[in-house]
Amino acid sequence: MIRLPAVAGAFYEGEEDKLKKQIEWSFLHPLGPGKIPQVPPQKSKRNNLFFIVPHAGYMYSGPVAAHAYYYLASEGIPDTVIILGPNHTGLGSYVSLWPKGKWKTPLGEIEIDEQIAMDLVRESEVIDIDEKAHLYEHSIEVQVPFLQYFFDSKTKIVPIVIMMQTPEISEYLAEGISKIMQKYKDKDIVVIASSDMNHYEPHEKTIEKDNMAIEKILSLDYKGLFNVVEEKDVTACGFGPMMTVLMLAKKFNKKPYVLKHATSGDTSGDKSSVVGYLSVRFGD
């Protein structure tokens, strides 16, 4: 079972060479980390287990996303990356997992970790096996070429799309993922929460609203993050994935570090109506 790319040629370049150059551009951009990381040949104990990464078109959010992938790649090739994304299409279940096969992009195919995927379905009470939610969803797909650029086909993924974004759902998810990470202690597992921040307001307003959410992220306050999103109308699309990694960070005693915060106005130059982007690592 192969999932074909839904947004190649739109959110990112549709040809292999152009896509590789676009990823390199993201790292070397003034808003990016400034250099392309080297993947170490030998594995060592991973410091940063969890990340928040944006998922817009690479021309807008690629440089911000590159900060997270700089740390991820610098610590070696992970065995499995669990990617949590919000559901923008309305298709599928409340929480939908793609169970097996491969995902295809212009950089090739990446394999699903079927063993961990099926164990996650068993361990978490809220995850359904449901491919429909993934067919046209971009929030997970745009993370895959970054992984392929550095790790080729040596890394496997577990894609999970969340439509019902509540603290309770995130609690179940975090508990299930935590059990899996403890069960497979010999495996190098990383979790990515895919989310953009506030949408379609002026640059200054977006920075102000994003900072309210970032304050809760830095205190690992997942319920506070939910309340800010609901009460202050901070239109971060992936607050469910973010709440989940905040809980995981607390369970595994990892601290949050903001790597980069910017908006689409910083890359496009148009600051009248922007989207906020945030890269966070959770490590020691």
Curated annotation (Swiss-Prot):
Pfam family, one: Memo
Signal sequence interval, chain numbering: none
InterPro entries in the record: MEMO1_fam
Taxonomy, superkingdom: Archaea
CDD domains cross-referenced by the UniProt entry: MEMO_like (cd07361)
PANTHER family: PROTEIN MEMO1
Family that this chain belongs to: Belongs to the MEMO1 family.
Protein name, per record: MEMO1 family protein STK_20620
Organism whose genome encodes this protein: Sulfurisphaera tokodaii (strain DSM 16993 / JCM 10545 / NBRC 100140 / 7)
